[in-house]
């Protein structure tokens, strides 16, 4: 779910708390991300005995699905958010080995046969560095299957949130802030993957509009989580309410997903 420390602002909290997530709530509200992950997992070609990496494991719901695909293998789960790593390890126990790491600085006990990632790469500012780190973690001919936010992702919602952030009592807290997201284009992503040593590359954008029946906990935990980092606690409820009022009901999020399928260059051993 989260993969890099460089995107968040430093005006609230310590580096650890500032970059953390509410793992318990995310585990409950992330049904859209889990549904997309189930689709993407079908793209992996696995026998069942591979060593695989979940790059940006979040609360571990998707990691559990991945572990089911390799009953005779092992899953490494990496996330930059301490609460997510703790939640994943507690939920899955010996089925996985979870590490709190920046994805651009991966250090795993061994090379992996495949890397899977869901709803994470758009949190990483430096995609060339990310893809180089992933390639280094893979065995030759290892698979990369990923999906993240792509160019145009929730543009309408982010525009509304920016309008609220620039107004009234909220404005001083967002002065000069541009947000941590990196919603990349498919063609540029393919070029970066190739430069990092990947081959058999396929990248494409996919609109996935999503309506939320209970939007408040979702936007608080997912869409506005980094906005709220900048606000004092007493302003958080009014900020969320103002954004949701502008967005209207039912809340339709104009998600655009960037799909990635590739292999590390080289011959399988």
Residue locations for each model-derived region?
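A short glycine-rich, Lys/Arg-flanked "PGG" loop and its adjoining helix->strand segment in the class I
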Residues: 128-143
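A short acidic, Gly/Pro-enriched loop at the edge of an enzyme's catalytic core
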Residues: 104-115
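A short SAM/SAH-binding and catalytic strip from SAM-dependent methyltransferases
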Residues: 114-127
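A short hydrophobic/small-residue beta-strand
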Residues: 144-145, 200
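Class I SAM-dependent methyltransferase SAM/SAH-binding core
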Residues: 53-55, 59-106
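Conserved class I S-adenosyl-L-methionine
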Residues: 2-48, 61-65, 84-87, 145-168
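Conserved Class I S-adenosyl-L-methionine
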Residues: 59-61, 179-269
